[in-house]
């Protein structure tokens, strides 16, 4: 992509919400410039890739801190809230419906990957080196 900024927040909020609950695979590129909190739940598993900034997420009753070059996995139907602590917070979101994943034979045995991790497991996805993180982002852009 030549100019990523043209894709930043380029979605309708209502369509975005519908996609989170109904599309097999959905990719978003968003940036928030205020630390405003938000609480929500959706059917899809959510993988967040933080490009810049950071925040605190509460998933079920567990707290998670995420910052630049970090990845956070949120299981489908897990209520979660977020508050940005470093703005702007620029992130990629990849959401996948669990039923779609379960329909793929090669993925079915790996379904635990798409559930919310414990805070200890989530720490393993923090501070990913630039080369690896950028490769993950380039894969998302191909979806």
List PLM regions with ranges:
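Short acidic-glycine-tyrosine-enriched beta hairpin
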Residues: 61-75
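Short histidine-centered beta-strand/loop micro-motifs
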Residues: 35-42, 59, 82-85, 105
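A structure-centric signal for secondary-structure junctions around beta-strands
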Residues: 44, 68, 88-90
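Tight coil/turn sites that cap or link beta-strands
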Residues: 33-34, 68-69, 77, 97-99
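Short secondary-structure boundary/capping segments within folded domains
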Residues: 16-20, 37-41, 49, 63-64
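Short, conserved beta-strand element in jelly-roll/cupin
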Residues: 40-57, 73
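A hydrophobic/aromatic-rich effector-binding and dimerization subdomain
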Residues: 1-26, 79-143
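Conserved short histidine dyad/triad with adjacent acidic residue
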Residues: 25-42, 51, 79
């Amino acid at each position: 992509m030549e100019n990523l900024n043209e894709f930043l927040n380029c979605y309708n909020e209502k369509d975005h919400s519908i996609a989170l609950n109904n599309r097999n695979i959905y990719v978003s590129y968003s940036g928030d410039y205020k630390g405003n909190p938000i609480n929500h739940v959706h059917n899809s598993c959510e993988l967040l890739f933080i490009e810049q900034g950071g925040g605190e997420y509460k998933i079920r009753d567990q707290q998670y801190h995420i910052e630049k070059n970090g990845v956070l996995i949120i299981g489908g139907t897990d209520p979660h809230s977020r508050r940005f602590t470093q703005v702007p917070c620029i992130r990629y979101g990849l959401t996948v419906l669990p039923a779609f994943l379960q329909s793929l034979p090669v993925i079915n045995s790996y379904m635990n990957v798409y559930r919310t991790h414990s805070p200890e497991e989530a720490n393993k996805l923090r501070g990913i080196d630039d080369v690896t993180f950028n490769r993950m982002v380039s894969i998302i852009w191909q979806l």
